[in-house]
């Protein structure tokens, strides 16, 4: 029997650096894990206002809150199976201008609340680039491909940030999800996601986000 209820809350504790600037973020989220819907309110508690675009942080607290993904019955849900022991994930984000972010997350559960402890490091963002100039305007919807390897779930996708004035800033995400106990492994599949910032104050020290996340098999399989 799953320890995950139809409606769950979660807490985010994120800390890290971007081009040497230290920050901390805390958040409170809620959603429906079996329907793939979630919302979160996030606050910069140290290091604000941030001298870089919020958008590089936004996927770490939602496309990062993986239990809130709707899975069909014929695909084993790797992450939900991992609880109550939980799981970890590690991610590398390679941007087209040479900037790199490394991220780790340790996810646990307390009652009807997930706890996410996130560590973030961003390096080599050009001073005149869209991140340090805060010229990004949110992520396009994306699709992650996922496959099993050595008891872990490997994810890979190509993301695109919308830019002020038009165009896109591209980034490849490589994620490794590791359950803290043996679970039934899924086959090759996809997860479609749409992440939006729905509200924020002028300096992005208080942000609200929502995400829809749905798993599926390949359309032409």
UniProtKB/Swiss-Prot annotation:
Effect of mutating residue 142 to S: Produces a fluorescent form
SUPFAM superfamilies named in the record: GFP-like
Record's keyword terms, sorted: Chromophore, Luminescence, Photoprotein
Function in brief: Non-fluorescent pigment protein that is lilac in color.
Protein name: GFP-like non-fluorescent chromoprotein
Positions bearing 2,3-didehydrotyrosine: 63
PTM annotation, UniProt: Contains a chromophore consisting of modified amino acid residues. The chromophore is formed by autocatalytic backbone condensation between Xaa-N and Gly-(N+2), oxidation of Tyr-(N+1) to didehydrotyrosine, and formation of a double bond to the alpha-amino nitrogen of residue Xaa-N. Maturation of the chromophore requires nothing other than molecular oxygen. The precise stereochemistry of the tyrosine has not been determined.
Subunit structure comment from the entry: Homotetramer.
One Pfam family from the record: GFP
Cross-link (2-iminomethyl-5-imidazolinone (Gln-Gly)): 62-64
Record GO biological process: bioluminescence
InterPro entries, per the entry: GFP, GFP-related
Biotechnology: Fluorescent proteins have become a useful and ubiquitous tool for making chimeric proteins, where they function as a fluorescent protein tag. Typically they tolerate N- and C-terminal fusion to a broad variety of proteins. They have been expressed in most known cell types and are used as a noninvasive fluorescent marker in living cells and organisms. They enable a wide range of applications where they have functioned as a cell lineage tracer, reporter of gene expression, or as a measure of protein-protein interactions.
Family: Belongs to the GFP family.
Domain of life: Eukaryota
């Amino acid at each position: 029997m799953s320890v995950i209820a139809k409606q769950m809350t979660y807490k985010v504790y994120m800390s890290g650096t971007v081009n040497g600037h230290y920050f901390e973020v805390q958040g409170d989220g809620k959603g429906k894990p079996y329907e793939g819907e979630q919302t979160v309110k996030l606050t910069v508690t140290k290091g604000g206002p941030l001298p870089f675009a919020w958008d590089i942080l936004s996927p770490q607290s939602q496309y990062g809150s993986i239990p809130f993904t709707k899975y069909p019955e014929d695909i084993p849900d790797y992450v939900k199976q991992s609880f109550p022991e939980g799981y970890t994930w590690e991610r590398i984000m390679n941007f087209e201008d040479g900037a790199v972010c490394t991220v780790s997350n340790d996810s646990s559960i307390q009652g009807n609340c997930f706890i996410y402890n996130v560590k973030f490091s961003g390096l080599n963002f050009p001073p005149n680039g869209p991140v340090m100039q805060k010229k990004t305007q949110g992520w396009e919807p994306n699709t992650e491909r996922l496959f099993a390897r050595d008891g872990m779930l490997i994810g890979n996708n190509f993301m695109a940030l919308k830019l002020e004035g038009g165009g896109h800033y591209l980034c490849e995400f490589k994620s490794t999800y590791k359950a803290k106990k043996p679970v039934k492994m899924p086959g090759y599949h996809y997860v479609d996601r749409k992440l939006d910032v729905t509200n924020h104050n002028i300096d992005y020290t208080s942000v609200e986000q929502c995400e829809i996340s749905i798993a599926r098999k390949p359309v032409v399989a």
